[in-house]
C-alpha cells in the first residue's frame, strides 16, 4: 500500500519521449501529419493556411478573412453551422497569427462524417456575407474602444510600435477607421490568394482510425481546391526602432499605471535562444522569479510582474509586464534595472538554478502529455522552421546551462540602454511612500484581526 506520509522522490527526466507524427502527402500535395494517441473517442483536425498579418494588403484583412469562415457558406448559413456543430458535440476554433491562419475542429469519432462535411464547406466555400460581417465589425469596434481605455492595452501596443515601427507588420497600430475599410470583396481577395490546396497543411490528432484518415484524404486530398496555387513569398521586414527611451501615455482617470519595458531579442532559430529562455525564466518567467521575489514579495509594488520573449518571424520581443500604483512607477522601474545588474554581475546560486530547472522541465512534461498538446508542439516546430530535435535540444539546454553562462548571456542580451520604457497611466509628481513588503503586510493584517477577535472575546466575557 502507498505510504502517503513519505514524499515521492524528486528526479529530473533524462529526456522527454515526444513521438513524431506520421506524415502522408496526399494526392493533391497537401501534407497530412497524424498523431495517433489517447484513449478517448475524439479527434482534432488543424488545417493551417500560410496567410497572416505578414501577407495582408491592409490592416485586419487576414484576421477577418479567418474570422468570417464560419459566418455562412454555399451549403450552410451561420446559424446552421452553429446549430449542427452544437448538436454533434463538436467545436470549431478560428485564429490568425503573423504568418498563418488556423482552422481547428474538435469532433467525436462517431460523428466525424457529419462534422467533416461542415468543416469542408467552411474551408472551401465561404461566402463572407455582408450582413454578418457588419455585425461582427460593429462588435469588434466596441471591443476595441473598450480596450483603448485600458492602460495595459495602450502600453502594450505602444511598446510594439516603438520597437518595430510603423512600416513593420508588428508595429502597425490598428485604428477605429481600419474596421470600416473591411468589406466582403477585401476578404474574398485575400481568401482567393491564400486559401488553397497548394498553401496548406493538415494535422490530425487523437484516437485516429484509418476510416478518419480516408475521409480526410477524400475531402481534402483527392483534388486541388482554391483559385491561386502560388506559394506565398517569404517576406522580410526590418524593424525601425524609436529613439525615445521612455514614452508616457496619459490617462488622467487611471487608478494605476501599466508599465511595459521591452526590446528586440532573439528569434527561435538563434543558437543561444534555448539558453536565453532559461535566463528569462529566472528573470521573470515564473512565480519564484527574481522580479516577483523582489518587486512583489519584498517591495510590494505590484501584485504581479513577469518577463518573457514574444516570438515573431525573424525576431523576438523581450517584454517586462507590470501594473502598479501611479506613485510607484519609478521605484518599480528602478528595481527592474537592479535585477538586470544582479544577473550581469553575480553568479546565480546553485539552489535557485535547480529550482528553475525543475520548474521548466516539469512545464515541458505537462506540455507533451496528450495527443492535442503533442499536435500543438509539432505545429509550433514546423511553423517556426525549427529542427525535429527541438524538444530534445530544449531539455538539454535547461539541464546543462551553468551560472557562468547565465551571467554571460545576461550581459550580452539584457541591454539596459536599449530597453524601452512605456508607462500608461496618471502622472504622479509626489514621491512614493515605500510600502511594506507584501509578506510583512499580510502578517501585519493577520495580527491586527487577531487582536480584534481577542478583544471581542474579552469584552463578552466581562459582560
Question: Which residues make up each language-model segment?
Answer:
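His/Glu-rich zincin catalytic helix
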Residues: 1-83, 188-294, 333, 337, ...
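Charge-rich, well-structured scaffold segments of protease-associated domains
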Residues: 1-6, 25, 80-231, 267, ...
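General helical secondary-structure elements
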Residues: 66, 292, 353, 403, ...
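Cysteine-centered motifs
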Residues: 428, 446, 456-457
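Aromatic (phenylalanine/tyrosine) cluster motif
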Residues: 438, 448-449, 459-463
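Short, strongly patterned local motifs
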Residues: 451-454
Amino acid at each position: 500500500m502507498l505510504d502517503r506520509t513519505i514524499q515521492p522522490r524528486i528526479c529530473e527526466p533524462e529526456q522527454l519521449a515526444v513521438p513524431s507524427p506520421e506524415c502522408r502527402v496526399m494526392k493533391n500535395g497537401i501534407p497530412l501529419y497524424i498523431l495517433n494517441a489517447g484513449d478517448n473517442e475524439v479527434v482534432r483536425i488543424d488545417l493551417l493556411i500560410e496567410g497572416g498579418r505578414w501577407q495582408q494588403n491592409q490592416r485586419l484583412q487576414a484576421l477577418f478573412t479567418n474570422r468570417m469562415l464560419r459566418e455562412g457558406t454555399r451549403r450552410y448559413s451561420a446559424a446552421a453551422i452553429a446549430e449542427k456543430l452544437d448538436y454533434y458535440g463538436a467545436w470549431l476554433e478560428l485564429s490568425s497569427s503573423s504568418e498563418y491562419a488556423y482552422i481547428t475542429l474538435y469532433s467525436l469519432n462517431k460523428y466525424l462524417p457529419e462534422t467533416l462535411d461542415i468543416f469542408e464547406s467552411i474551408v472551401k466555400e465561404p461566402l463572407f456575407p455582408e450582413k454578418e460581417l457588419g455585425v461582427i465589425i460593429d462588435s469588434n469596434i466596441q471591443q476595441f474602444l473598450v480596450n483603448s481605455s485600458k492602460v495595459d492595452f495602450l502600453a502594450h501596443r505602444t511598446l510594439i510600435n516603438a520597437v518595430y515601427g510603423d512600416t513593420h507588420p508588428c508595429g502597425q497600430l490598428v485604428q477605429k477607421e481600419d474596421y470600416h475599410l473591411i468589406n466582403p470583396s477585401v476578404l474574398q481577395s485575400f481568401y482567393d490568394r491564400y486559401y488553397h490546396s497548394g498553401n496548406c497543411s493538415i494535422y490530425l490528432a487523437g484516437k485516429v482510425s484509418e476510416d478518419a484518415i480516408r475521409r480526410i484524404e477524400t475531402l481534402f486530398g483527392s483534388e486541388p481546391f482554391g483559385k491561386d496555387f502560388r506559394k506565398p513569398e517569404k517576406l522580410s521586414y526590418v524593424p525601425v526602432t524609436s529613439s525615445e527611451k521612455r514614452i508616457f501615455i496619459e490617462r488622467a482617470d487611471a487608478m494605476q499605471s501599466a508599465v511595459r519595458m521591452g526590446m528586440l531579442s532573439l528569434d527561435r532559430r538563434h543558437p543561444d535562444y534555448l539558453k536565453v529562455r532559461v535566463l528569462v525564466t529566472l528573470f521573470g518567467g515564473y512565480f519564484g522569479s527574481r522580479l516577483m521575489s523582489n518587486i512583489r514579495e519584498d517591495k510590494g509594488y505590484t501584485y504581479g510582474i513577469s518577463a518573457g520573449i514574444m516570438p515573431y518571424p525573424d525576431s523576438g520581443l523581450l517584454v517586462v509586464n507590470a501594473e502598479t500604483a501611479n506613485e510607484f512607477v519609478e521605484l518599480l522601474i528602478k528595481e527592474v534595472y537592479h535585477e538586470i545588474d544582479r544577473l550581469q554581475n553575480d553568479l546565480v546560486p546553485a539552489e535557485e538554478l535547480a529550482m528553475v530547472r525543475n520548474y521548466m522541465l516539469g512545464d515541458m512534461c505537462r506540455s507533451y502529455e496528450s495527443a492535442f498538446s503533442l499536435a500543438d508542439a509539432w505545429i509550433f516546430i514546423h511553423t517556426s522552421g525549427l529542427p525535429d530535435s527541438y524538444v530534445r535540444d530544449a531539455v538539454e539546454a535547461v539541464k546543462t546551462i551553468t551560472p557562468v553562462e547565465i551571467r554571460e548571456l545576461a550581459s550580452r542580451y539584457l541591454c539596459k540602454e536599449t530597453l524601452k520604457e512605456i508607462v500608461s497611466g496618471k502622472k504622479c509628481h509626489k514621491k512614493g511612500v515605500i510600502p511594506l513588503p507584501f509578506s510583512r503586510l499580510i502578517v501585519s493584517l493577520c495580527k491586527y484581526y487577531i487582536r480584534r477577535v481577542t478583544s471581542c472575546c474579552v469584552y463578552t466575557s466581562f459582560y
